[in-house]
C-alpha cells in the first residue's frame, strides 16, 4: 500500500504573493509563461479548494532548462494537455529563471516550495492537495512527482495514476 505523506508546510499564506507584490521591475504583473498556469500558490490553493482538484506544480527553469522547454513544447503547449488539465488539476508554474529577475516574493515562494519538496533537478512536477490549519499554515498531501515524460498521453496517464492511487489509498484507509 502506497503511503501518502502529509506534511505541514510552515509557510504562512499571508507571507506569499499578493496582487501588488507580483509586479516586475517594469511595472507589469508577473505571469506564468503559458495560459492556464498560475504563479501564486495562494490563488492555486483557493482554486483547488473551490474545485476539489489537486495542484500540479511545475518546477522549471523556463529560460535555460532544455528538458523544461522540451516538456513545455511536447506536453504543456498541446491542446490535448490543456483540455485534460482544465478537467483534472490546478496548474502552478514555479520558475527559477537565470536571464530575468522574479518579484522577490515570488522568488521566495518558489524557493520555499522547492526546499519543501526537495527539488534537485528540472523539470520536476509535483501533484498535491493542500489545506490550511487553524494557524493559517498550509498542510500538503503529496500525491506524487514526475519529471520529463515524452508525449501528452504518457504524461497525463502518469498523473492520473498518481491521483487514482492516492484516492484508492484514502478509501482503503477509511475502510480499516
What does each of the following model-derived ranges do?
Residues 4-13:
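Sec-dependent N-terminal signal peptides
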Residues 52, 60-64, 121:
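Short pre-active-site segment immediately N-terminal to redox-active cysteine/selenocysteine motifs
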Residues 60-76:
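Conserved redox-active cysteine motifs that mediate thiol-disulfide chemistry
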Amino acid at each position: 500500500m502506497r503511503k501518502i505523506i502529509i506534511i505541514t508546510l510552515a509557510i504562512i499564506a499571508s507571507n506569499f504573493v499578493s496582487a501588488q507584490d507580483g509586479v516586475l521591475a517594469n511595472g507589469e504583473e508577473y505571469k506564468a509563461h503559458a495560459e492556464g498556469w498560475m504563479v501564486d500558490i495562494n490563488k492555486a490553493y483557493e482554486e483547488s479548494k473551490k474545485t476539489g482538484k489537486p495542484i500540479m506544480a511545475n518546477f522549471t527553469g523556463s529560460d535555460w532548462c532544455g528538458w523544461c522547454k522540451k516538456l513545455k513544447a511536447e506536453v504543456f503547449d498541446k491542446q490535448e494537455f490543456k483540455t485534460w488539465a482544465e478537467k483534472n488539476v490546478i496548474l502552478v508554474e514555479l520558475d527559477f529563471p537565470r536571464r530575468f529577475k522574479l518579484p522577490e516574493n515570488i522568488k521566495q515562494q518558489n524557493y520555499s516550495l522547492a526546499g519543501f519538496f526537495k527539488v534537485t533537478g528540472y523539470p520536476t512536477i509535483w501533484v498535491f492537495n493542500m489545506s490550511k490549519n487553524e494557524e493559517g499554515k498550509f498542510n500538503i498531501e503529496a500525491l506524487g512527482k514526475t519529471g520529463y515524460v515524452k508525449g501528452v498521453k504518457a504524461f497525463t496517464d502518469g498523473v492520473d495514476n498518481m491521483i487514482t492511487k492516492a484516492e484508492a489509498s484514502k478509501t482503503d484507509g477509511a475502510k480499516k
